[in-house]
């Protein structure tokens, strides 16, 4: 039986929960097994977490919050560039933001493996769609800013825009699903940025330059 302090026991439960979630996935991971590995009773577990879902949240929320903060900073930078420079500069800045995004994911790889590979049965199974919806809001804002500059942007039907944006994030997250090394993932983002920037230019009617 665990005889450590509250903080030590808390960390032990987090450690064993993470290992079992990574191995079994959220749905198959057994709460009693987490308790057994951690040397606590189920009653002892509930002094730390409301339930298995609460434990999962504790493991992934810090990484998600950090990613969202980085994403917000990238948004601000991209919109500032768009307001003060031409359309061409935004593709370069967006590619750099993509590399930062992926670098953060690989610096918190176990958390994102939990989110992308092991979250079925939790609200985090919708993580990709959360990112898609946020990106689409940014695209609409980008279109508005370009319109103010006198640049005409073709409006895509919402379902088409969702489909293409989902494909974009799916490609990014493939690097986690298929166990890329960080260096290889970052290298692949250069190809991904070239591919999608050319595609976005085409479908939005922004030309080749």
Segments from the language model and where they lie:
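Amphipathic alpha-helical segments used for helix-helix packing
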Residues: 75, 79-84, 93, 99-122
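Alpha-helical structural segments
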Residues: 12-19, 23, 33, 37, ...
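Amphipathic alpha-helical packing segments from all-alpha helical-bundle domains
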Residues: 100-107, 122-148, 159-166
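Short hydrophobic/aromatic patch on the recognition helix
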Residues: 39-49
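Amphipathic alpha-helical segments that line or abut small-molecule/effector binding pockets
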Residues: 88-110, 162, 166, 170, ...
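Hydrophobic/aromatic-rich alpha-helical bundle segments in the mid-to-C-terminal region
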Residues: 2, 114, 146-195, 204-209
């Amino acid at each position: 039986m665990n005889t450590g302090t509250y903080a030590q026991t808390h960390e032990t439960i987090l450690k064993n929960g993470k290992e079992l979630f990574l191995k079994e996935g959220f749905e198959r991971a057994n709460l009693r097994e987490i308790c057994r590995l951690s040397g606590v009773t189920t009653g002892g577990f509930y002094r730390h977490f409301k339930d298995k879902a609460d434990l999962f949240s504790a493991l992934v929320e810090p990484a998600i919050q950090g990613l969202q903060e980085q994403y917000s900073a990238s948004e601000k930078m991209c919109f500032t560039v768009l307001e003060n420079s031409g359309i061409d500069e935004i593709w370069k800045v967006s590619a750099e933001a993509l590399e930062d995004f992926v670098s953060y994911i690989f610096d918190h790889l176990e958390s994102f493996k939990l989110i992308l590979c092991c979250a079925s049965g939790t609200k985090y199974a919708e993580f990709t769609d959360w990112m898609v919806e946020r990106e689409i809001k940014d695209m609409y804002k980008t279109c508005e800013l370009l319109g103010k500059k006198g640049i005409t942007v073709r409006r895509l039907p919402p379902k088409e825009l969702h489909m293409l944006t989902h494909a974009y994030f799916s490609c990014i997250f493939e690097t986690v699903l298929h166990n890329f090394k960080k260096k290889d993932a970052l290298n692949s983002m250069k190809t991904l940025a070239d591919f999608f920037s050319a595609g976005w230019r085409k479908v939005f009617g922004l030309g080749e330059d």
